[in-house]
Amino acid sequence: PIATGERVTSLAAFRDLFAARACAVCQLDITHCGGLSEARRVAALAEAWRISLAPHNPQGPVSTAASLEFGFSQPSYIICETVHEDVPWRQDVVREGFVVEQKGRIVRPNTRPGLGIEINEAEVRKHPFQQELLQRVFGSDGSVGDW
């Protein structure tokens, strides 16, 4: 099966992708497609086309919590990409409300309210965002390309 959609940013673009039968798995990215409300609309459209959901999620702990909770609320959810060892201080900045079981890498829904995480704001301030790589590509004609 073909999985795609991590760089798709609008409901209309997902509609075109699904209508073309271009994928079997939709990898919408909540941080790119317009947040939880728009992701819900994309998921409903995917379900109408019988397309599974596997949220794309290479971001941090807030995105992970949102992607997991969103996935658990969707009937066509099959798997979620997660990153847990992205930075050595991750456990210092957030207490996550879910556990990844080592056998099978299974995650169960958390039982806490909201996204189920607690953010340590003081610790977050110790690690300001720094862009490692400028994610902008220009073609020889000056057009902006996909990073």
Task: Enumerate the language-model features and the residues they cover.
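Shared catalytic-loop signature of beta/alpha-barrel
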Residues: 1-114
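Extended hydrophobic packing segments that form well-structured cores
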Residues: 115-147
